[in-house]
């Protein structure tokens, strides 16, 4: 499946019910990855409102709280600025306890990494090796503030591997990918694992 679902695209109570059912049906194999959303063109393509980054991050934190409440409580209630649930029942519960591993995706240093420190089991960052080391240090500081054991959180690196036999082949592959995704070529060519065979 995809690396990370965008919180803005589904009501978090509904998404939690879907995730719980998938975990139950799969014998406890779901890993739940969610982020605040970032790609404005995708929002526009599917007719979703594209709130400011601050609003999307507040929505993500509320969604994380709903996910945890609905997977661990018989009847969950939550009153937030963006989402509300009242005695929401989530059955079947996920098989994994307390809930399927929670990936908090994104590398924003002030808020997203704080949310990872507070709620997440896994983090995933779209950076180079130096950026990975830097994000890890920031996460560690957030863990200290949250009184969270930093070593409990698994840190992962997201990168694209695109290798061409030669420059012409690489350019052709990049063009196909850009045509399909609409993501600018620079988002790929700035990564360390994009190039020609040597």
Regions found by a protein language model. Name each.
Residues 1-198:
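Active-site-adjacent structural elements that line small-molecule/cofactor binding pockets in enzymes
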């Amino acid at each position: 499946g995809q690396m990370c679902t965008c919180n803005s695209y589904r009501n978090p109570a509904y998404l939690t019910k879907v995730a719980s059912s998938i975990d139950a049906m799969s014998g406890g194999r779901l890993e739940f990855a969610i982020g605040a959303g970032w790609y404005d063109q995708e929002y526009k393509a599917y007719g979703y409102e594209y709130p400011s980054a601050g609003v999307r991050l507040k929505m993500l934190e509320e969604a994380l709280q709903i996910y945890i409440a609905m997977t661990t409580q018989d009847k969950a209630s939550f009153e937030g600025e963006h989402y509300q649930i009242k005695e929401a029942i989530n059955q079947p519960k996920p098989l994994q306890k307390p809930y399927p591993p929670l990936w908090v995706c994104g590398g924003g240093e002030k808020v997203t990494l704080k949310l990872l420190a507070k709620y997440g089991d896994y983090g995933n960052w779209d950076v180079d090796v130096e950026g990975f080391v830097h994000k890890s240090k920031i996460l560690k500081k957030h863990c200290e503030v949250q009184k969270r054991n930093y070593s409990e959180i698994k840190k992962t690196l997201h990168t694209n591997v695109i290798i061409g036999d030669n420059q012409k082949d690489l350019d052709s592959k990049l063009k196909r990918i850009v045509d399909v995704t609409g993501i600018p070529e620079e988002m790929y060519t700035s990564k360390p694992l994009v190039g020609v065979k040597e």
